């Protein structure tokens, strides 16, 4: 009987453990020490998403460069939508990345905005079907501060044909959000003044937030030096708005779709929340629809 209980317990643990976490071979957030020890590893792609000028001044040896702006597209009036699958296939294939590649995305952390642009690229690769995608904790700022090796050699990757296995379940559109108001946990990751409607960007038609949304600012995920807070701290912060019911569906949004991938990435990839989506149209799309409710 005791042995049976043990088997039942292990079975429950297995069922509770997200399948995509099993597929990972690298952690979702890697340290500078971890990455430094793997420079030259042919199984690892270092993707530098800074502007080409910054890349040319000095980058992690072996890193390839594709600016973060190449991974988000303007569609109509919306600023930051996921690329069309054919275009994304071309972008990923051009830098020699395959579905089996392990990729560490590296950017700057001079501003919080640069940090979440880096994470958006990581989420885009996950959407395309890669499993081993990570971001460098502290970005190039921490790398340089620690006097780790730099190179000015421009790396020219060998292109390959890429066909993604697209994870459409990672994104939600406006219609889905509307249909499920009151059933899903909406997480507004903007700073409090924008969430409350005290401030708004010019590209957002109406101030305020989607009714029922909780406020979880992107900046809360980071320390003052641009590194992530500890996993334990991030879990406490996430559960302050999601509660202990991690199995409920969670949708993150922001102003234009740039920063909402940050908490999506943290909750899904690091903390193991199984049902987290991004509404990339965000308040830019929602606020422009007069039939979509907004509250302050």
What feature does the model see in each segment?
Residues 82-176, 199, 208, 259-276, ...:
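Thiolate-centered catalytic microenvironments shared by cysteine-dependent enzyme domains
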Residues 10, 19-21, 257:
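Cleavable N-terminal signal peptides
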Residues 73-102, 218-250:
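Helix-loop module immediately N-terminal to the HCX5R catalytic loop
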Residues 51-54, 69-73, 109-113, 140-142, ...:
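Solvent-exposed loop/turn segments at secondary-structure junctions
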Residues 1-8, 19:
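Bacterial N-terminal signal peptides that target proteins for export
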Residues 14-57, 140-206, 294:
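Flexible, polar/low-complexity N-terminal or interdomain linker segments that lie immediately upstream
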């Amino acid at each position: 009987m005791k042995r049976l209980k043990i088997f039942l317990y292990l079975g429950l643990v297995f069922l509770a453990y997200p399948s995509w976490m099993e597929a990972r071979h690298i952690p979702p957030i890697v340290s500078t020490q971890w990455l430094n020890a793997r420079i030259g590893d042919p199984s690892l792609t270092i993707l530098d998403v800074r502007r080409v000028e910054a890349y040319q001044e000095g980058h992690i040896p072996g890193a390839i460069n594709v600016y973060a702006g190449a991974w988000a597209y303007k569609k109509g009036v919306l600023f930051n939508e996921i690329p069309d699958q054919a275009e994304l296939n071309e972008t990923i294939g051009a830098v020699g990345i395959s579905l089996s590649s392990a990729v560490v995305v590296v950017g700057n952390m001079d501003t919080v905005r640069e940090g979440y642009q880096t994470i958006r690229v990581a989420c885009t690769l996950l959407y395309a079907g890669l499993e081993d995608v990570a971001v460098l904790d502290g970005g190039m700022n921490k790398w340089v501060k620690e006097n780790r090796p730099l190179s000015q050699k421009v790396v020219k990757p060998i292109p390959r044909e890429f066909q993604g296995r697209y994870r459409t379940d990672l994104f939600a559109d406006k219609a889905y959000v509307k249909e499920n108001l009151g059933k899903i946990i909406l997480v507004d990751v903007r700073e409090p003044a924008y969430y409350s409607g005290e401030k708004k960007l010019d590209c957002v038609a109406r101030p305020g937030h989607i009714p029922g949304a909780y406020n979880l600012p992107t900046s809360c995920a980071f320390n003052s030096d641009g590194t992530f807070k500890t996993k334990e701290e991030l879990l406490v912060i996430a559960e302050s708005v999601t509660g202990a019911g991690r199995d409920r569906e969670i949708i993150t949004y922001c102003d234009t779709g740039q920063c909402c991938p940050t908490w999506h990435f943290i909750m899904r990839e690091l903390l193991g929340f199984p049902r987290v989506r991004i509404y990339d149209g965000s308040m830019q799309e929602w606020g422009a629809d007069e039939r979509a409710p907004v509250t302050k």
